[in-house]
A protein has these predicted regions:
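Non-heme di-metal
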Residues: 1-202
Length: 202
């Protein structure tokens, strides 16, 4: 991030532009900037809440776009995707202000820890869904639990091999989210979906 010394505009991009987009000041007036002094404040709580809300809006609009495409509303689908992109930008900006993006090694470590935590959270969700006779919800939670454990293994593997980064192709099951590294499975080991349900990630 950077801040204009003239007009105090804050830019959220990594790279400084040649001029401030608000007042036109030259690049030498655009100085590095970090948000500080927000620990324990409502601003910090609002940034966290904003990140969650924008992330949810991003994903919700992608789901709405998918449904619009199924119903042959191509223009509406494009609108939902465009707004999803904007909401994703908002979420990313909030996360950066929360110092939630570090170097790649730290990001992998944080992602590994979050996946481990998530896989430990799901057993309680599954138990409660079963107790309330919500079998389909329990199944989705079971898929998520099993897939999160796999994600943690992939992050750990990446952490161990960062120095000698291999060119690996990933395949994601569009039913349960299972990620296969290196080869396309004949069927998903978590939900049993056929290989046609996998998408390659470049």
């Amino acid at each position: 991030m950077w801040k204009c010394a003239n007009c105090h505009h804050v830019g959220l991009t990594e790279d400084r532009p040649f001029h401030c987009p608000v007042c036109g000041a030259d690049a030498d007036k655009l100085v590095p900037h970090q948000v500080s002094g927000i620990k324990g404040t409502k601003t910090l709580q609002n940034l966290k809440a904003g990140f969650v809300a924008e992330s949810q809006a991003h994903q919700r609009n992608l789901a709405f776009a998918f449904k619009a495409e199924q119903e042959d509303y191509a223009q509406v689908a494009r609108l939902f995707r465009a707004i999803a992109e904007a909401e994703g930008i908002h979420a990313f900006n909030h996360l950066r202000l929360l110092s939630g993006v570090s170097d790649t090694h730290e990001n992998l470590q944080a992602a590994f820890e979050r996946e481990n935590l998530a896989s430990k959270t799901y057993p309680q969700f599954i138990k409660e869904a079963n107790e309330e006779d919500n079998v389909s919800v329990a199944r989705i939670f079971s898929y998520s639990r099993d897939v999160e454990a796999g994600h943690a293994k992939l992050y750990k593997k990446a952490l161990e091999h960062m120095v000698q980064e291999a060119d690996t192709k990933y395949y994601v099951c569009s039913v349960c989210g299972y990620v296969s590294d290196g080869e396309l499975p004949e069927q998903c080991p978590i939900c049993g979906a056929p290989k046609e349900k996998f998408r390659g990630i470049d």
